[in-house]
Amino acid sequence: MTCPHCAAALTARERTGQVCAHCERPFALDPKSHGRGMNDLRIRRIAAAATDDGRLKVTVTQLWYLTRTYSGAWGPTPAHGIRPFVRWLLALPLALPLFLWSAFSDGLWATLTGAAALAVVGTAALAKRRTPGRSGGSLITPAESRFRQLMDDRWRSTYGRLPPGVVDDGPRAPAVRESPVGRPAAVILCTDHAVAVFLRVNGIPARLRARLVEAEPAAAHEALVDVPGRLPVVVLHDASALGALLAPLLRLAHPDRVVLDAGLPVTAVRNRRGAVHRVSAAPPVDADGLRAVAGLSDEDAAWLSDGYWSPLAAVPPSRLESVVTAAVKRALTARPGALGAADGFLTWPAGEPTPAGTTSRTKGAPAG
């Protein structure tokens, strides 16, 4: 690896204990110890790009998604094969009479019945063994807990703070002070904590004269109780089943209110190369309901009903900023009931198709 201080190419022996043997200065990460792609220069480079060279601040969660070296997701697989009990329950009643017939017969009949009995037993013994079903899952390398540990322990102990422009959004992090908004003109309803911290720390709601409301999708209706009904609502959510249903259900509950869906659309990530795909452990949502309520295509509804989802926090920060800005401006000029299911998706990029029938796998920024 390359020393982040003197740029010397270091062998394993020249970087023992995360200290450069040439300049004798410590560094935080070593790919050999902390995993592929985990080195100071790469983390700094990705953080600089994410913050637009210092113009924006980003969260540790956003940096984690951007610095991942691998992500993959797989759907559930049904059980297949025959249970041993069933195999022998069928085979023994057939094989036993044949063995008896062979034992008490002579000549050709004994040979044929004996061979048939052996064939039945052999088929039962060699039949495909039952493989239990497997639930879907996903994998991101490094894991979020591991990445946070590296940032909190190794990086802070080496440099005294997180990379420039990166803020902690963990559960123990202090709350971010939000710039005051005198008379808000709109509401931004955000269901992702990392994205809400990103918006607050960059003063985006105040700049747009919007009130930021953070809530889980299931609690979104209650979170809007204290918000004046005249204010338009811009909804930010993951590309998930609950996220896709949120804006349509809010429109039904508040027919006199502008509700603009600016969440991450499934069409932008389902077949997009490089998008992060994850699998939820929550009970599946019926595909028919997703089509009827959210107006999704058959393919998108099936993808979500299989448990797949994609996090809003994985969207590049500059793209996220531009989408939120455009969505609030659009909501301010819209009329109640005039927005359809596709409105709010106009600023999101279309997905780049991937070969059908393959496991969802994406790689993060180059690990070099």
Task: Walk through the language-model features, giving the residues of each.
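Nucleic-acid enzyme cleavage-core boundary/entry regions
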Residues: 1-231, 246-368
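Acidic beta-strand-to-loop metal/phosphate-binding motif
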Residues: 228-242
